[in-house]
Structure formats: C-alpha cells, structure tokens
UniProtKB/Swiss-Prot annotation:
The gene is recF. This is DNA replication and repair protein RecF. GO terms for cellular component: cytoplasm. One of its GO terms (molecular function) is ATP binding. ATP binds at residues 30-37. GO terms for biological process: DNA replication; DNA synthesis involved in DNA repair; double-strand break repair; SOS response. Disulfide bonds: none annotated. Belongs to the RecF family. Transmembrane segments: none annotated. It comes from Cronobacter sakazakii (strain ATCC BAA-894) (Enterobacter sakazakii). The RecF protein is involved in DNA metabolism; it is required for DNA replication and normal SOS inducibility. RecF binds preferentially to single-stranded, linear DNA. It also seems to bind ATP.
Amino acid sequence: MSLTRLLIKDFRNIENADLALSPGFNFLVGANGSGKTSVLEAIYTLGHGRAFRSLQIGRVIRHEQDAFILHGRLQGDEREVSVGLTKDRNGDSTVRIDGSDGHKVAELAQLMPMQLITPEGFTLLGGGPKYRRAFLDWGCFHNEPGFFVAWSNLKRLLKQRNAALRQVTRYEQLRPWDRELVPLAEQISQWRASYSEAIANDMADTCAQFLPEFSLTFSFQRGWEKESDYADVLERGFERDRMLTYTAHGPHKADFRIRADGAPVEDTLSRGQLKLLMCALRLAQGEFLTRESGRRCLYLIDDFASELDDARRGLLAQRLKATQSQVFVSAISAEHILDMTDKNSKMFAVDQGKITD
C-alpha cells in the first residue's frame, strides 16, 4: 500500500503539515536542520510507533507541546485504510486504524512495511549482531504470521529467566522457564534460518550489481552450538549463566554475518561501499517481500547524495524505480535528485519546519 496523504502535528520542528503524496517518488529538499529528515521520521514513526533518531519521546514532541499526532491514508489495489498515532510525553500511545482505537503498533507495521536507509544505517553492517538480527526479524515478521507473538514471548521468558538466575541455586528451579523457552527458541531460529536461506540469492544478485568487485557471502549463526540441542545447552550452562546472571546462549545471541572476499565487510569496504551494500540489502529484502506476498515496501532514504557518486546514485535510482514502490528521498540540493524525477513524482521544499510543494 502507498501513503497518499500524511498529516503531521507537533512532531520535531513541524507544527502542522498536510501533504498529498505521490505513489512513486517523493522528494524533500532543504538545508540541514530544515526538517526534511523529520518528515521521513514522522512516516517511520507512524509505521513503527517510535522514531529512528531518538528513543526519548521528549525530543520528538515539538517544544512546549503535550503530544504529537500523525495521521496517514493508505491506498492499496482494493482498499483504502486510514491510520493514526498519537503519543504524549509520558510515552502513552493511541493507535487508530480506520477510525477505531485500541490497536497495536504491530498492526501499523504490518500495513506499512518500510525500508530505512540513513547515514546512521551503517550499524546494520558494523554495529553488532543485534542490528543484523533485526534485519532478519523484519523479514520473519512480514513473512511468518506467528513470528511476532513467538518473538514477544521469547523476550518475556528470557527476561524472567535472567531474573530467576539471581535467585535460584539448582537447575531444577529453572526448568519451568526452559520448558517454555526451548520450543520458542528453536522455532524462531528455524524461521530465521529459513528466511536467510530463502533471501540469499536475492541478496547475492543485488550485491553483485552494486559491488561487482567483491565476492560476498552470508551466513546465519543461531546463537548456540550448531549440533547441540538447546535444552542441553541451557542445562549444561546453568552454573555459568548463574554467575553471569544472564542467559549466555540462545536466539538472542544470533548473528547474520556478511563477508567480502572472506573478511568482515566493516573491515574491508569503504564508507561509500558500505552504503551501497546497505542499499543493496534493503532493496533485496523489499523485493523479496513483494515477490513472496505481493506487498510493496515504502523506502525512506535520508541524505541521498551522501557517500555516493553520480554513477552509484543513478544505479540506486534505477533499481528503486524498478520496484514500483513508493519512495521518500531527502536531499540538500535538488541537483542531486533531478535525474530521478518524472511526471509522477512530487517535490517538497522544506524550510524551518514549513513544507511546500
């Protein structure tokens, strides 16, 4: 589904905005600090319930206001859906879908699958395993209907188990948690492994187009010994876990490793090449979703020209257009995106939180 209309109130430096959007490319042009990234962040927040630049709600709500309000209209082939999110300074949220309250943020995420490409997005490649787990979990969330509930239950059980490790003296006292934890861990790991295998060819093909000078490999590590039963791992590791006061092995320690010519990509690629790789991975993931489910992503790209030369920008623009997805791009200068515009695209000028088309 594409976002045809966006209303923003008291979000970052934007007091009020009402934007009619293109189902294709939408460009946000303005100087640094003008508010163009805030528009991207508002869209992201509408689909995720949280901002991507700050987890502190006070920094997202406009100065001296009590709450932000976001509203969007989504248009699909067969239906139109209205979505809304309000969040106050206490962090209390109201999610509204088609006029009714009481919905969950996960429902917004299902309606609005997004791929975010920002200058800070290098964390996907060099920021540690949790960011690469999140990459896999995004795919599992949108491809496996039971994933979100299982993942939420896993987080809850791990938190309870870790708390219990501070109190118990014998493994038998932990067994009730592990009886629930083990099947969830194995199911989530199987979903991640299946997804990483299914998308491998898409990633390899897209990366070969963006970075033909490198041989890239991808491997999923589930977070405990490959041939070991997870129940045995937990029981054998009880004394170590009790000393650490947390569970040392499991799906919460999984990783998705990416290597270039046999070495970690963060040690091999330049910043420009890392951005290309990040773009390739996000594109491959979005295209895989479309092929498997018929749904298209919204692509949010902040500071489009950063780290990319003209040829690389042209390649990325070409691939994005081929997806027939809705794309939002911020840039400091219109010159950087002129070759991406067409009769169906829209360009917005952003200046001190004011947005005009």
